[in-house]
Amino acid sequence: NSKFIQNLIKDVEFISKFDVKKITSKDGLNIIIDKFGNRLKAKTVIWANGFEMTNLSQNLPINPISGQVTYLKANELSSNLKINFSYGHHFSQAFKGYHQIGASFNRNANTCFREIDQNANINSIPEFLRKNIFYNITESGHRVSVRASTKDRMPFFGDLSSLTGKKSNNIYILGGMGAWGFVYAPFYAELLVTKIINDQLVINSKLEKLLTIERLL
């Protein structure tokens, strides 16, 4: 997975710790301003900030769904597993000495640890794994994140002006990936970029209407 991601972003400059607070326009460019007053200039802006995208407009139909994953320290037997398991939950092969199990679904934006979710993840381990490989759990950890879901469980892309009703200066939105961002994001990003550069979409008009933000408004 890491090699796939690295290949996607090989020509991308990543700027961290830039908490965007405001975007203004001047001379055909968007001025992106952070909380310290630092500025970046961009011809095109794409908002892809998960459930926090609702800060752009109350009309955006995104539902926050928090999820907790559990990390279990691999043992001598489990380290040899070369397969991931999916059974309502998921159980990954070891990465950097830990397996990942998850994830819970809670209809809120709470990122606090929940013992009930931790136990549910651990108890979800299939019996054949528990009996033969994970009969003794020695160490566990966790991570809680928030998914951005839509009412029809499908992502969206489009122009910000479709959402706000106000003309935007090349500002777009891409979101609603839910728990399937790794699958959906590359495809939806390609559709959005194709739209931005006024190229021919690889999908027909009926399918386009089912994928854009307009279907949710």
Predicted features and spans:
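Helix-loop-beta segment of a Rossmann-like dinucleotide-binding subdomain
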Residues: N1-K10, K17, S104-N108, N169-G176
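Internal, well-ordered alpha-helical segments in soluble enzyme and binding-protein domains
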Residues: N1-L8, S16-D19, S66, Y87, ...
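Short beta-strand to alpha-helix junction loop
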Residues: N1-N7, C112-D117, A179, V183
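A conserved short coil-to-beta-strand element within the FAD-binding core of flavoproteins
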Residues: I15-I31
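Core beta-strand elements of the Rossmann-like FAD/NAD(P) dinucleotide-binding domain
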Residues: K35-T44
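Active-site substrate-recognition segment that forms the wall
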Residues: T44, N49-N169
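C-terminal catalytic lobe of FAD-dependent flavoproteins
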Residues: Y135-L217
